[in-house]
Amino acid sequence: MEDLKSIIRNIPDFPKKGILFKDITTLLGDAKSFQRMVDLLSHRYVGQKIDKVVGVEARGFIIGAALAYKLGAGIVLVRKPGKLPSQTRSKTYDLEYGTDTLEIHTDAFNKGDRVLIADDLLATGGTMAAVVDLISSMDVELVECCFMAELEFLEGGKKLPEGKVFSLLKF
């Protein structure tokens, strides 16, 4: 895993001073590394029945679509308000300075679907907790929340269901 971690570029003071941003575009842009990352993540779920993979806007779309393809599952998009064309349900959640809202189509799942939620990075866990809450009343089974990378020191996993979090790379 160290080889994949080393490809992720560190950008100091982005998006604001004091933050060391993990730029995953360097890994995504390297074909062999991207393929290896998708293979490693998907391998965890081979043999489990995954009906839908939920991709969280925006980089979660990349990870989610690749995993859905590898697992033979459908892809469901969770987006910011006003981006989905049909009837939606929404979840507003707190940020450090304000709130944000996510939406999902009301007909995104079939009853009893086994769902994997995918995103690029687990930081504080606020966004993923909102996604878990959003789908929790949709009569589906959450298999796991999976991430390409996690910033462990932010302890975002504590906001998510116990035993339902997997991160390939940990910083």
Curated annotation (Swiss-Prot):
It comes from the Bacteria. It is found in: Cytoplasm. It holds the Pfam family Pribosyltran. InterPro entries: Ade_phspho_trans, PRibTrfase_dom, PRTase-like, UPRTase/APRTase. Signal peptide: none annotated. Pathway: Purine metabolism; AMP biosynthesis via salvage pathway; AMP from adenine: step 1/1. Its EC number is 2.4.2.7. It catalyses: AMP + diphosphate = 5-phospho-alpha-D-ribose 1-diphosphate + adenine. One of its GO terms (cellular component) is cytoplasm. Keywords: Cytoplasm, Glycosyltransferase, Purine salvage, Transferase. One of its GO terms (biological process) is purine ribonucleoside salvage. SUPFAM superfamilies: PRTase-like. The keyword Cytoplasm applies. One of its GO terms (molecular function) is adenine binding. Belongs to the purine/pyrimidine phosphoribosyltransferase family. Catalyzes a salvage reaction resulting in the formation of AMP, that is energically less costly than de novo synthesis. Homodimer. PANTHER family: ADENINE PHOSPHORIBOSYLTRANSFERASE (PTHR32315:SF3). This is Adenine phosphoribosyltransferase. It comes from Geobacter sp. (strain M21).
